[in-house]
Amino acid sequence: MIEADRLVSAEVLQDDEAIDRAIRPKLLSEYVGQPQVCEQMEIFIQAARQRGDALDHLLIFGPPGLGKTTLANIVANEMGVNLRTTSGPVLEKAGDLAAMLTNLEPHDVLFIDEIHRLSPVVEEILYPAMEDYQLDIMIGEGPAARSIKIDLPPFTLIGATTRAGSLTSPLRDRFGIVQRLEFYNVDDLQSIVSRSARFMGVEITDDGARQVAMRSRGTPRITNRLLRRVRDFAQVKGNGAIDGNIATRALDMLSVDAAGFDYLDRKLLIAIIDKFMGGPVGVDNLAAAIGEERETIEDVLEPFLIQQGFIQRTSRGRIATEHAYRHFGMVRNQE
């Protein structure tokens, strides 16, 4: 089982990007959720524009699917500058990054997704570029090699990562602004559902929007993906409009329950409760019991279940919490 097979995956799936780009907010005033981040960014952007400066370099981190790329686009729009986009794995050689930097216009935004995956040699190029707006390039090889400096226009680097702890200290310290994106509450997700439905030309009631929001695992990317599938259901099984009943039937058919769990989440929890008496159970035994890889459990399934309080990870193994028992209408055996 891979993350790309799951409807409730927070990672980008094949049909997400083009549709998400069409409904993506363009300005801070259109951005739903993350109120503290929006308030701070509005001040920082306004101050930079008043001074005629480039915005300070910005690091955005948090779980996947929460809007890091969207926020980078908004920053460029609010600053009235161009956005150049790339990602850590794409920048294999120092020359790849140098080519992008030398093509920037004053105050442009360079957005590097998955910045924690930059190679050390590329990262070294970034240090003087971020700090002094200079590019240090080695010309030639061996004893004849020499370093030349190229001046760069003032620019803003926006780095996005799901693993802020994987960034080296020298790189992390060069970001003047650091923003963490949190999981969204149901009210904000409901607003996102309603907004996306308008862009898609779909009629949806408040109850229908809330049903989709409740099962979206706090993640707008999942919200929009579920909405597209519910729209299909409403089109074929109803009159095209989405109300609470249609949304519930559609999501039940898709095996996404009221907590946002899919069959794999439920399979894991039921295995701990039924096969291992609620735990503790080691991850290797658990992987064998449900027929999945250890990495799938640790990297794909566990983070959300732990964050929601359904699994506790201890030194002796995984334990199903009372929350998990209540979700399935079960009572823990006290013996």
From Swiss-Prot:
GO terms for cellular component: cytoplasm; Holliday junction resolvase complex. Homohexamer. Forms an RuvA(8)-RuvB(12)-Holliday junction (HJ) complex. HJ DNA is sandwiched between 2 RuvA tetramers; dsDNA enters through RuvA and exits via RuvB. An RuvB hexamer assembles on each DNA strand where it exits the tetramer. Each RuvB hexamer is contacted by two RuvA subunits (via domain III) on 2 adjacent RuvB subunits; this complex drives branch migration. In the full resolvosome a probable DNA-RuvA(4)-RuvB(12)-RuvC(2) complex forms which resolves the HJ. Pfam families: AAA_lid_4, RuvB_C, RuvB_N. It is an enzyme of class 3 (hydrolase). NCBIfam families: PRK00080.1, ruvB. Keywords: ATP-binding, Cytoplasm, DNA damage, DNA recombination, DNA repair, DNA-binding, Hydrolase, Nucleotide-binding. GO terms for molecular function: ATP binding; ATP hydrolysis activity; four-way junction DNA binding; four-way junction helicase activity. GO terms for biological process: DNA recombination; DNA repair. The keyword Cell inner membrane does not apply. This is Holliday junction branch migration complex subunit RuvB. It comes from Photorhabdus laumondii subsp. laumondii (strain DSM 15139 / CIP 105565 / TT01). Has 3 domains, the large (RuvB-L) and small ATPase (RuvB-S) domains and the C-terminal head (RuvB-H) domain. The head domain binds DNA, while the ATPase domains jointly bind ATP, ADP or are empty depending on the state of the subunit in the translocation cycle. During a single DNA translocation step the structure of each domain remains the same, but their relative positions change. Residues 4-184 are annotated as: Large ATPase domain (RuvB-L). Belongs to the RuvB family. Residues 258-335 are annotated as: Head domain (RuvB-H). The RuvA-RuvB-RuvC complex processes Holliday junction (HJ) DNA during genetic recombination and DNA repair, while the RuvA-RuvB complex plays an important role in the rescue of blocked DNA replication forks via replication fork reversal (RFR). RuvA specifically binds to HJ cruciform DNA, conferring on it an open structure. The RuvB hexamer acts as an ATP-dependent pump, pulling dsDNA into and through the RuvAB complex. RuvB forms 2 homohexamers on either side of HJ DNA bound by 1 or 2 RuvA tetramers; 4 subunits per hexamer contact DNA at a time. ATP binds at residues 23-24, 65, 68-70, 131-133, 174, 184, 221. It is found in: Cytoplasm.
